Regions:
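A short helix->loop->beta-strand "cap" motif at the edges of active sites that frequently abuts
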Residues: 48-52
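Oxyanion-binding "anion nests"
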Residues: 146-186
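Glycine/threonine-rich flexible loop motifs
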Residues: 27-39
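Glycine-rich, charge-decorated loop segments at or immediately adjacent to ligand/cofactor-binding or catalytic sites
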Residues: 54-74
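Short acidic catalytic loops
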Residues: 20-28, 54-57
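Conserved functional hotspot residues or short segments at active or partner-binding sites
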Residues: 169-217
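Glycine-rich oxoanion-binding loops at beta->alpha junctions
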Residues: 1-17, 30
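Conserved anion/nucleotide-ligand pocket segment
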Residues: 74-147
């Protein structure tokens, strides 16, 4: 059962061949992350097919007490308007959408034991297992809600390096001056240092925003 946008039209027919659909995917607490919308499509498909949908809930790595950032425009892969940092677990999102969108699915959320809304990931005792290739560390998840804004610009957000979303740059950016300026702003919990990198991306990949690919940033 493919959970990516080009395949969503076929989800109800595919779901009709199943007895139950179990969703067990780690989220990162950000509206940018596509798997929560995949869950929404799958939830609706199960409702249309008349089969149960079960979510094995997991902690929100960013915690559940802070909600911040603008709402994403619900279009394309972003099916619902969520703030950049939404403060919810996938089980909570599924429960909300099942009601607000009127899916009416036979939804069961297997709740976690021991997790509290104010609990940072480090306090869960869980190991970080990368939920997708560009989400390799907890630090990546922490900066992702803000750093992903650079993905919509003509700069590199670090994809194609070993530290995606932990670096940003372009050939026309003075790394030393940028780091000095940002450090001078005294942003709590953030330290910036100059870095130079080459984002290695297939030259044939779509590049509608004119990002610097395979060149020094």
């Amino acid at each position: 059962l493919a959970l990516t946008l080009p395949h969503v039209a076929h989800m109800p027919a595919l779901a009709a061949k199943l007895d139950v659909l179990l969703f067990d995917i780690q989220g990162v607490g950000s509206a940018w992350y596509p798997f929560q919308y995949s869950m929404s499509w799958a939830l609706e498909a199960c409702a249309l097919a008349g089969i149960p949908f079960i979510v094995l809930d997991r902690p929100n790595p960013l915690g559940g007490r802070v909600v911040e950032g603008p709402l994403l425009d619900p279009r394309g892969i972003f099916r619902h308007a969520l703030p950049l940092r939404h403060g919810m677990t996938y089980g909570e999102l599924a429960t909300m959408w099942n009601q607000t969108e009127g899916y009416g699915a036979d939804l069961t959320v297997i709740r976690m034991q021991g997790w509290r809304r104010g609990m940072p990931w480090d306090d869960t005792g869980l190991l970080w297992v990368m939920p997708s290739p560009n989400m390799g560390t907890l630090e990546t998840a922490l900066v992702y809600p803000g750093q992903c804004l650079f993905e919509r610009m003509n700069v590199s957000e670090g994809r194609g390096t070993t530290k995606p979303f932990l670096m940003v740059g372009a050939p026309w950016v003075d790394a030393e001056k940028a780091a000095a300026d940002l450090n001078g702003r005294g942003i709590p919990g953030a330290v910036f240092r100059p870095a130079h990198f080459i984002p290695r991306i297939d030259a044939g990949s779509p590049n509608p925003r004119g990002k610097p690919l395979n060149q020094m940033c």
